[in-house]
């Protein structure tokens, strides 16, 4: 009987408790932090983290969506370029469909993945280390967008190293979405805001 070991990195998210933060820093834990909410904490982490701990920067797109604020993609790119040598990976600035608290239209749902992909391409061309950029595929989006990510090649004909999978944990079909998405991916993937095993 063959045993297959699947290795993964666990990233601890959030920066609301200074004691937990200090402990994670001391332990050399991997961190996922939002550039929208955690820049001060990221600055401290960049200065003090061990060489073997990993830092994943999230755009904060969902937090911006819930607060009704926008994020400048150019500001985000400039910020990432300023700390890129200390980061392992960073999430693209993705587009969440519609507005918080309002019913999402069909047009909202169709436009969001297209706008996200356009942001990915825009960012990729402007980052110092674009190979660290993670495009995000959201539950509810047409799987053509995931296949697009899998087929995409940069100007050196290299495929993506990472793809982010973003489940909607509050809707039916989560297990089917994760199974279908993960079965097709032969790249490193990150499952956003999801930390239970199925």
Report residues per predicted region.
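Non-catalytic, usually N-terminal nucleic-acid engagement modules in DNA/RNA processing proteins
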Residues: 1-126
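Short beta-strand/loop segments at the ligand-binding rim of alpha/beta enzyme cores
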Residues: 6-10, 52-57, 128-134, 186-198
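A structural motif corresponding to the C-terminal end of an alpha-helix
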Residues: 79-89, 119-133, 156-159, 184-194
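Glycine-rich phosphate/ribose-binding loops and adjacent secondary-structure elements
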Residues: 133-198
């Amino acid at each position: 009987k063959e045993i297959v070991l699947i290795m993964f990195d666990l990233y601890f998210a959030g920066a609301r408790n200074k004691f937990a933060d200090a402990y994670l820093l001391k332990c050399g834990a991997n961190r996922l932090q939002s550039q929208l909410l955690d820049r001060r904490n990221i600055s401290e982490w960049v200065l003090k983290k061990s060489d073997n701990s990993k830092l994943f920067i999230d755009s904060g797109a969902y937090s911006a969506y819930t607060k009704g604020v926008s994020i400048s993609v150019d500001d985000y790119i400039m910020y990432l370029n300023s700390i890129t040598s200390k980061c392992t990976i960073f999430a693209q600035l993705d587009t969440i469909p519609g507005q918080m608290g309002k019913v999402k239209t069909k047009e909202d749902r169709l436009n969001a993945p297209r706008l996200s992909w356009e942001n990915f391409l825009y960012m990729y061309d402007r980052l110092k280390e674009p190979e660290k950029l993670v495009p995000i595929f959201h539950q509810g989006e047409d799987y053509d967008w995931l296949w697009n990510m899998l087929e995409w090649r940069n100007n050196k004909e290299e495929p993506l190293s990472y793809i982010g999978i973003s489940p909607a944990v509050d809707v039916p079909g989560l297990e089917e979405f994760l199974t279908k998405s993960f079965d097709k991916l032969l790249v490193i993937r990150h499952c956003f805001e999801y930390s239970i095993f199925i």
